[in-house]
Every structure is written in C-alpha cells, then in structure tokens.
Amino acid sequence: MTEAVYSASERTLTLTRDYPHPIDRVWAAVATPARIADWMGVQWLGDEGAVLHQGAHFDYRFSNTDLESRAHVLRFEPPHLLEHSWFENVPPPATVRWLLEEITSGTRLTLTHFLPMFEEAPRTGAGWTILLEQLAKSLGDQPAPVDWRALRDDYANRFGPEATRDGRLSRAGDRQLLTFDRILRHPPEKVWEVLTTPEGIGRWWQSDAEIEPRQGGRFHLRFRPFDHSMTGVVTIYDPPERFGFTWPDTAAGTDSHVLFQLRPDPLGTHLRLVHDLPAEADATEFAAGWHWRLDGVDDAARGLGTPWDEQRWRVLQKVYRMTL
C-alpha cells in the first residue's frame, strides 16, 4: 500500500510504496518513455523509444483530454534517481522526484512532488496513489483497489485545511452547491475588506465594483478582462462574517446565489464560499473561475493585485471537467 505525507511548510507531497521486484526492473518502468505512457495512461509527446537523460524532454498528454504537461529531466541517475519538472507550460511549474532504494523485499519507491503555491495536495496525492497502483499492475502485481474521490477526501482530512484548494460539488434536489474552503493568514476584518469593497474586489476579481453595503443593495461588477458586466442584489451583509448576493443570468436562465462565510481560525480566517446553482448550470465553469480568483485573495489582503491569467484558468477548466 502507498503511504502519503504532506508538509505544509515545505509544500511537499511524499508517497512511498514497496514493490517486490529488483530495482532495475522498477527503474525500467519509471524511466522508459513507452513504459511510462503505458502505466500512466498518457500519450507520450515525442519518441517513446528514446533514452531519457538530463535535459531530455519529459512531455505527455493526459488521455481523453487536451491537457498537456511540458517538462524536462532535471536529474537522471540510474537506477536510483529521476527528477523532472512538471507543467512548465503552466507557471509556476512543479518538480517531481522518483527515488528508488533496494530493500530486502525488493524496491522502495519514494515519489516527492514539490508543489507550486496554488496546487491542491489531496487531489494530486489521490492521483499519484492510483498511478502507483497502475505501476504495480504493469509489473505483474495485484493492484490495491482505490476509490479516487474517497481517497481525495481522506487525504483532505489528513493533510489539514491549508492543503485543500479545490471546490467540491454536492447536489440537493434541483440545486447544486459548489463549495470552497480556504485558510487565509489574515484576520477576518482584512478578508472582509477584500471581499466587500471596490478597492479590495478590484485586486483579486479584476473587476470594477459598485456595492451598496446593505441587504437589498445593488452589487455591480464590470469584469475588465472580458468587458462584461453583471448586476446582482446584496442578500446578506453581516460584517465581518457573511456576505451574500445574487448572480443573475446563468446559463440556466435563472439567478444563482453566492455566500461568503468568514470565521476566525488559529491561522487567521477560514473562508467558505458557497455558490448555490440551478441543476442546469455549468458548475465546471464556475468552479474554475472561483478557484482561480480565490487564489488571489491572499495577495489582495496584502494590497497586491493579481493579473488575469487565461492559461491557468483554462487548465483549471480541464481539471474540473475530470474531477468535479
């Protein structure tokens, strides 16, 4: 079985699994492009028969999607160490290290994923766990059954609240609830200012905002990157704990409802966003948009603006189509 450990301070995800095979056999499976493509279920972008070396391309496309990771081999020390970048095409890139050690029962593989600032550790950990079981199957072993969603949620509980950045979708009757939980290292009063004032909103939402700070007040946004506007109604205004408003003209043709909830946390503020959507709405689009924008709230609380990054937003769309 795979053991997974997450370090919030170092932003590393480490997975360890033992294989009852000689180190050379396991190395061939993790360091040969054709073998990698087979057990990872990806399309290798390049010559599958090529021999990897330091500086070589390490590019592949995830099957049944157009999501690509463009990368390079950073260290190559057979049969013990392979280190490569990951998603250089979507800054900031990550780094993945494969370390193989000989043990009495065969080979111990330790995979360390050095996460960029905005990566989701539970989702990434569950994905790697499944892939390490697929590696076992490719070596002729019986893989352990893994439920990806259940494992992701288990890792979320184990890794702690700062590790989770993805939204979660649940359904209630003819509605669907998109929920994000974020831990922000700022007091609730500072986060409230970021969420509810034109100056604060402009830093993380890339929008010009007009807000009447009262229940029933007008809430207007003009999204600068898209030259598009929306006008809703403030439904809840309870500083510094709850701020809600309607989101009009969804694809389903009816209003949806957004609620921000803030509560003190030992690290600062626990921010929860709940977007109550009609069943017909495209939750994937909202998930990608909220995810990207919430990533900018921390900088906004420090007075910094976040420029629009369409490339990352499109990658998040692809991720949520696979995982939401």
Residue locations for each model-derived region?
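Structural motif
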Residues: 9, 76-78, 103-105, 185, ...
